[in-house]
Amino acid sequence: VCVLAHHFGKEFTPQVQAAYQKVVAGVANALAHKYH
């Protein structure tokens, strides 16, 4: 997340961070579900 914030600068708003976290959580959930 810190790398993304540094890369995007002012474009990396709390809304963008929330969307990114939602995607990461979805991917992690899908992977966890796949392996169980």
Curated annotation (Swiss-Prot):
Residues 1-36 form the Globin domain. Gene3D superfamilies: Globins. The modification N6-acetyllysine is found at residue 34. GO terms for molecular function: heme binding; metal ion binding; oxygen binding; oxygen carrier activity. Keywords: Acetylation, Heme, Iron, Metal-binding, Oxygen transport, Transport. Red blood cells. PROSITE patterns: GLOBIN. InterPro entries: Globin, Globin-like_sf, Globin/Proto. Signal peptide: none annotated. Involved in oxygen transport from the lung to the various peripheral tissues. Belongs to the globin family. Heterotetramer of two alpha chains and two beta chains. This is Hemoglobin subunit beta. It comes from Pongo pygmaeus (Bornean orangutan). The gene is HBB.
